[in-house]
Amino acid sequence: MRYFAEKLGYGDEVDFWGMVGLLHDIDFEMWPEEHCVKAVPLLQEAGVEERMIHAIVSHGYGLTPTAAEPDHEMEKVLFACDELTGLIGAAALMRPSKSVQDMEVKSVKKKFKDKKFAAGCSRDVIRQGAEMLGWELDKLFEETILAMRTCEK
């Protein structure tokens, strides 16, 4: 998320975007069936500002009944990339390098088309996220790979 903040001209909000990225799945491991629902009271109790809570919860749009539609560019990026990072991460593990450093868009496209590969990663959500951003899938794939490379160093 920090990569995207810089790339999209939100350099003054890099830490905010990064924190949203770190916290977005705060409730998933303990309450997968209530993902993006349990996050709200957890984050409120921790004193997290409402703007950040909204951003975190919005990545569950369409998947959980309480998640608002992403409206800020950051929320759209998180929505689009959440499922995609799972697919790219799984694809990286299949490579000899086990890394995204040598990952290419064409490799992601091939895995994206194979519905059995990383089947839990919703291709529909990825497509919807790209549409929200006004991006072609190739651009989303490329930028997400580049973002993941910065986290892997």
Regions found by a protein language model. Give the residues of each.
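A structured, mid-to-C-terminal "fold-capping" secondary-structure block
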Residues: V100-M103, S107-K153
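Divalent metal-dependent catalytic cores for phosphoryl transfer on phosphate-bearing substrates
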Residues: Y10-K115
